[in-house]
């Protein structure tokens, strides 16, 4: 498999530290607000990577963290009067619900920073002991001047605009130096004094705790949004070099921005489009399809028109799924599977891979039109659809349930009552009443289909 390494700035062959195994760490959200589409893009992109590696036969260990102690969370506490736990638990639950809607696989481990304080403190202590951290009146700082390879990850330089992203403090030895531990009597005990961890000290310690390897690298792949490359990932890598005398990750992968009106989408810019808002207009899988249809490294401008176009492509997959309802899957068509995996093995070339999916859907429908009772064809189509679900994470729903999107629970209850009434009418051979109920449902924009599995319905 070929992946784009952000450090080498080119595609390279993925050769894991341990043959047949892949360790991946993805920077998760800071939980002070609902997830926006930028968070979703990152989660879905690297969920796709994980799925592809699994399909290729790798054993994957996947960790995604929660930053649940941070300046932004403290500001939210101040603004709302709520506790740290109230805020973080609310937004972790919100994020989890969004990820479930997007059919993102659960990480193997999803640590919170507050659960890893001992590991974080020990990591900072190691940096202090090695003489690469120093104390100021407001906290413990990392001395970037002690790391000869600082900037080697991002390829940046002493650009003033970039350095401005690092928290300022006139007493720092160098403007690039960053805080490891912030003194604050309200928080946690440590050998340095009461306080809380700095953002950059959290992820590197969690990687050490959950994914560490002997040898030259801690993990195979460190992933996240391209906006994290500097300073966050640069600072993580610097700490690992100085504390462990090794590289944090063998490969670094970054997804691109989602823009709104050609500006990067972010909470700080106030132009966030939340996942929960997008999910009001389309099913979660349609949003997922939209996000993976563009290459993970591409920056693209959010468009509702493109979102609906993505849903129409997904609709075709589900309409095909309905045509093989109740069919047991046979064997996936080898050439189709090979074409998809070949494209995805080229740095997740989803455009090419999804073109193969579109071609399969068309040819499958053509085949069923010619021979609708061909059991072998139906079994192969069902197997191909299962493969699509495993790899792309779409097509997992019941075919009819997918087309019930937008129907309220009250409406579903009314529809069920009418269908039950129709079933009873048919049992009593009162076919005129059954037809009347069908017409009544059609007037409600509900289409019904009698199948071996029972009467199914969908929103027209």
From Swiss-Prot:
A motif ('KMSKS' region) lies at residues 264-268. It catalyses: tRNA(Cys) + L-cysteine + ATP = L-cysteinyl-tRNA(Cys) + AMP + diphosphate. It holds the Pfam family tRNA-synt_1e. CDD domains: CysRS_core (cd00672). NCBIfam families: cysS. Monomer. This is Cysteine--tRNA ligase.
């Amino acid at each position: 498999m070929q992946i784009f390494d952000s450090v080498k700035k080119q595609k390279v062959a993925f050769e894991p530290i341990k043959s047949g195994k892949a360790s991946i760490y993805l920077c998760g959200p800071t939980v002070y607000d609902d997830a926006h589409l930028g968070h979703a893009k990152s989660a879905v992109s690297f969920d796709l990577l994980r799925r592809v590696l699994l399909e290729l036969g790798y054993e994957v260990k996947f960790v995604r963290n929660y930053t649940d102690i941070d300046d932004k969370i403290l500001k939210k506490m101040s603004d709302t009067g709520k506790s740290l736990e109230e805020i973080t638990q609310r937004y972790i639950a919100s994020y989890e619900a969004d990820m479930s809607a997007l059919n993102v696989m659960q990480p193997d481990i999803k640590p919170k920073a507050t659960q890893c304080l001992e590991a974080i403190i020990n990591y900072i202590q190691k940096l202090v002991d090695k003489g690469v951290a120093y104390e100021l009146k407001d906290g413990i700082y990392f001395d970037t001047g002690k790391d000869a390879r600082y900037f080697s990850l991002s390829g940046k330089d002493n650009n003033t605009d970039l350095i401005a992203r690092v928290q300022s403090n006139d007493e720092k030895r160098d403007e690039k130096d960053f805080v490891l531990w912030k003194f604050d009597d309200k928080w946690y005990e440590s050998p340095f004094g009461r306080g809380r961890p700095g953002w950059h000290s959290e992820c590197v310690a969690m990687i050490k705790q959950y994914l560490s390897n002997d040898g030259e690298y801690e993990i195979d792949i460190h992933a996240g949004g391209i906006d994290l490359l500097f300073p966050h990932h640069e600072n993580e890598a610097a700490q690992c070099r100085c504390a462990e005398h090794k590289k944090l990750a063998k490969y670094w992968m970054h997804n691109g921005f989602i823009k709104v009106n050609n500006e990067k989408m972010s909470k700080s810019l106030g132009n966030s489009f939340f996942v929960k808002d997008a999910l009001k207009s389309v099913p979660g899988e349609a949003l997922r399809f939209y996000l993976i249809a563009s290459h993970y490294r591409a920056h693209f401008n959010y468009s509702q028109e493109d979102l609906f176009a993505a849903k129409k492509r997904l609709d075709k997959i589900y309409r095909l799924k309905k045509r093989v309802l109740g069919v047991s899957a046979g064997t996936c068509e080898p050439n189709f599977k090979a074409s998809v995996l070949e494209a995805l093995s080229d740095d997740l070339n989803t455009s090419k891979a999804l073109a193969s999916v579109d071609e399969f859907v068309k040819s499958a429908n053509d085949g069923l039109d010619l021979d609708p009772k061909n059991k072998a064809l139906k079994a192969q189509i069902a197997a191909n659809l299962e493969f699509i679900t495993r790899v792309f994470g779409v097509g997992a729903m019941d075919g009819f349930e997918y087309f019930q999107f937008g129907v309220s629970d009250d409406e579903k209850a009314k529809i069920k009552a009418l269908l039950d009434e129709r079933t009873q009418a048919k049992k009593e051979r009162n076919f005129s009443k059954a037809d009347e109920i069908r017409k009544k449902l059609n007037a409600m924009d509900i289409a019904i289909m009698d199948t071996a599995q029972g009467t199914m319905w969908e929103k027209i």
